[in-house]
Amino acid sequence: MKPKNTICLWFDKDAHAAALFYAATFPDSKVTAVHKAPADYPSGKKGDVLTVEFTVVGIPCLGLNGGPQFKHNEAFSFQIATDNQEETDRYWNAIVGNGGKESQCGWCKDRWGLSWQITPRALTDGLAAGGAEAKRTFEAMMPMQKIDIAKIEKARRG
């Protein structure tokens, strides 16, 4: 049964490649269907992959090969919670090392321009603590690209 809510992500032409990458990178992620265009359309031809149904950490998504009209930006991102530095490094390196780009505060973009937040729970816990602990956590995070959990935990302790 199809879910009531699905995130639709517009790609130029690489929705299938992106979905396969996400399925190989993140747990509870898979490609569930590939649909080909039944006729020519403005950004493709009959038989080209038009849409791809997939999940990213259990979130249902639809990749649409709609052409170059619209680009991904930071207004939408997937936030992936991590439990340790190894997991943080693995996801970060998979995204950045596969043609992506580093950004600040745990944010990065994949090679298709989709934004990701690779967010250790130690960071979110420190920011949620309030008061001086949250301030120290925030100040430690601000100059980071990939989050260094040891530095975050040191800042949390003061």
Would you name each region that the model predicts?
Residues 44-50, 70-72, 133:
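A generic structural micro-feature
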Residues 9-58:
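Core segments of cupin and vicinal oxygen chelate
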Residues 6, 49, 103-105:
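Short loop/turn microsegments at loop-to-beta-strand junctions
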Residues 11, 25, 56-60, 71-72, ...:
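Vicinal oxygen chelate
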Residues 132-158:
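C-terminal cap/linker of serine protease catalytic domains
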Residues 41-43, 74-76, 157-158:
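A charge-rich, low-complexity, intrinsically flexible signal that marks solvent-exposed coils, linkers
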Residues 6-8, 51, 77-79:
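Short aromatic/hydrophobic contact patches that present stacked aromatics
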